Amino acid sequence: VESITEIRKRFVAPAMSLGALSPEAHELLAVAMNRMGAASNSGEGGEGIERYKPKDNGDNANSTIKQIASARFGVTAEYLNSAAELQIKVAQGAKPGEGGQLPGFKVTAEIARLRHATEGVSLISPPPHHDIYSIEDLAQLIYDLKQINPSALVSVKLVAQSGIGTIASGVAKAMADKIVIAGHSGGTGASPWSSVKHAGIPWEMGLAEANQVLTLNRMRHRVTLQTDGGLKTGRDIVVAAMLGAEEYALGTAALVAMGCILVRQCHSNTCPVGITTQDPALRAKFEGTVDKVVNLFSFVAEEVREILASLGFTRLNDIIGRTDLLTQVSRGGEHLVDLDLNNILALADAGSHARYRTVIGRNEVPDTLDAQMLKDAHDALERGEKIQLAYTVKNTMRAIGTRLSSMMVRKLDTSQLQPDHITLRLRGSAGQSLAAFATRGIRFELLGDANDYVGKGLSGATVIVRPRPSSALI
């Protein structure tokens, strides 16, 4: 039967920001997940660059997954290039349709620095991303993220709801690599209590529909499905696998392993065990350890192994999407007698494709003008010399300068560069996302016009757009 080590690699610590969690809890969770070869999610709010490199003892506090949420707090070129996976948070299961809010009393000097905000001022994330109002806009953001980090997978976090199958299909067509289906449970770190109790639907309903529609549309093998929202036991993991999930996020359970006693004061900055507070006196009471978190996930993985063995299977892949292994039982009150779960338990026809992701690597997107820019600037950058490049652009050339920014962040200390280390003189109509996430050291001079999202996520670059002298606009 598949080993504990292999099963643990499918586990994820879901998005909980540095702000919702104390610095100690946030870092410990990342170290624990990295030690297991699993993944932790930074949540919305950035992460200190000192965590991007392994510690002297070999532990790694860098969150494998970096989240891009609606307010884009802490989202810089450096942040995006420190991840193996970039997650676009469209919504959160515990509070669907709502934004987020970090109260001012939680915004310490350190959190304000990471989020590029003001200490003591409440930070509000709007319900929508203001650059996503259609599936095409989402596809553009996925494209931009795959340019700023040429090696990272891109995931999209959705909320379980009726019709999610159609949405998931659109996300898959937009070239996402992973889709997260979030259920109504959870939301421990920073969700309003009224939403935690009354909003959302179970992950089982959303996961089953997303898996069925993706399978019927012959796209299931292109994407990974992950689910979260109250998963606690090995049985939960096995049921999620049978309903179609390949990865499993345990958030509240991980906090309990660190010492959470479920006082439900997460949003008030008064957590008595130092997990969801920024108060130094309360943070001093934090007693969580990496071993405790590793032990929890190890025991859950062991229970998964035992259930697999009892069913006669040797790998989790063998049961993914196998809803025929689930049966409805009558148990509980009279109000449950008429409950019909046939829609959830329907087995979709996968045809000749697998019921789980078989694509190796990520779903690649087309190159941009940057492929040529990197060739032209290579020698000068290797010598540390300034360079000026000129190009004629057209509106099909998207995310100009973004891949170049990625290369500079990875190879150079951009904080020490002159603003015009590389000058790009462009002429024509630039496509969407000109200078998206562009870093310090690049100067863009465009004579002409540009489409949407100019300077999205700008990380220090200079962008100058001037109309043509012959333009009728001036």
Residue map of PLM features:
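Alpha/beta catalytic cores of nucleotide-metabolism and tRNA/nucleoside-modifying enzymes
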Residues: 1, 7, 17-24, 28, ...
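Active-site-facing alpha/beta catalytic cores
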Residues: 7, 18-144, 148-171
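Structural beta-strand/beta-sheet cores of well-ordered domains, especially the beta-sheet scaffolds
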Residues: 9-17, 36-38, 64-66, 84-94, ...
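Acidic/polar N-terminal loop/beta-strand segments that form early-domain functional surfaces
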Residues: 21, 43-45, 392-394, 427-429, ...
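Terminal amphipathic helices with adjacent charged low-complexity linkers/tails
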Residues: 42-84, 89, 105-109, 157, ...
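Glycine-rich phosphate/ribose-binding loops and adjacent secondary-structure elements
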Residues: 50-51, 126-284, 397, 401-406, ...
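Flexible, charged surface loops at secondary-structure boundaries
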Residues: 79-82, 172, 382-385, 417-418, ...
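Internal, non-catalytic "lid/hinge" segments that mediate substrate recognition, gating
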Residues: 114, 411-414
